[in-house]
């Protein structure tokens, strides 16, 4: 059985992608269980995607498609995907999110030893807390560290055009920024559900805005 333990879910994965196959190997379950989610790409759908994405390799197409299916499935299990970098602290973690138009990747500003989840960590509610999970999906899935999870304490949005210095955000500021950070991985019909997820999340997690990450240590001490 192609069963893997990812974000505390039993996920059945059928893939021909060499990249994804290598990334998920570390997550393989050593038990048999009914899967919570099954991820697969049919031959017909693969042909359609190849025609729609001329010049893109089959490996990249399948890896991206499976990551998208996984992201969609999170909403069925009290979770969501977010374009961010998860930064580890002593007893919890912080998500650093920056819009594409900022023109830089947060990873270039964060000391590597502090990063435990790259690009698209999964976030799920368990009991009364929220946890960020390292996953094998996405362009940097091969850097995953076998599904670790840490309690999520705050989300920091980096936007040089909006913020001058570190400050805590009110809902009117962070709601559109949060939706933008997850929008790439949600279907239109999930928008209302995503707002419901955010409504619960905001009672457990703090939101901050900052101009840049030049004073990374200071930011981590304050959020």
Where are the predicted features?
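A conserved segment at the C-terminal end of the G1
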Residues: 100-114
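A noncatalytic interaction/capping subdomain that flanks phosphate/NTP-handling catalytic cores
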Residues: 1-95, 112-114, 121-223
């Amino acid at each position: 059985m192609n069963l893997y333990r990812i974000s505390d879910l039993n996920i059945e994965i059928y893939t021909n992608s060499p990249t994804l196959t290598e990334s998920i190997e570390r997550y393989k379950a050593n038990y048999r269980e009914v899967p919570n989610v099954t991820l697969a790409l049919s031959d017909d759908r693969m042909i359609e995607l190849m025609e729609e994405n001329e010049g893109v390799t089959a490996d990249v197409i399948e890896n991206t498609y499976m990551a998208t299916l996984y992201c969609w499935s999170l909403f069925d299990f009290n979770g969501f995907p977010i374009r961010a970098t998860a930064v580890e602290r002593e007893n919890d973690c912080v998500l650093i999110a920056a819009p594409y138009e900022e023109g830089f990747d947060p990873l270039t500003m964060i000391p590597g030893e502090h990063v435990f989840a790259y690009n698209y960590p999964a976030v799920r509610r368990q009991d009364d807390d929220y946890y960020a999970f390292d996953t094998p999906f996405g362009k940097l899935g091969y850097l995953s560290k076998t599904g670790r999870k840490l309690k999520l304490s705050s989300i920091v949005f980096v936007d040089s055009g909006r913020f001058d210095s570190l400050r805590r955000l009110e809902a009117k500021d962070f709601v559109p920024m949060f939706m933008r950070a997850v929008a790439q991985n949600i279907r239109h019909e999930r928008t209302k559900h995503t707002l419901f997820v955010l409504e619960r999340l905001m009672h457990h997690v703090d939101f901050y805005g900052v101009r840049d990450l030049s004073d990374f240590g200071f930011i981590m001490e304050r959020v």
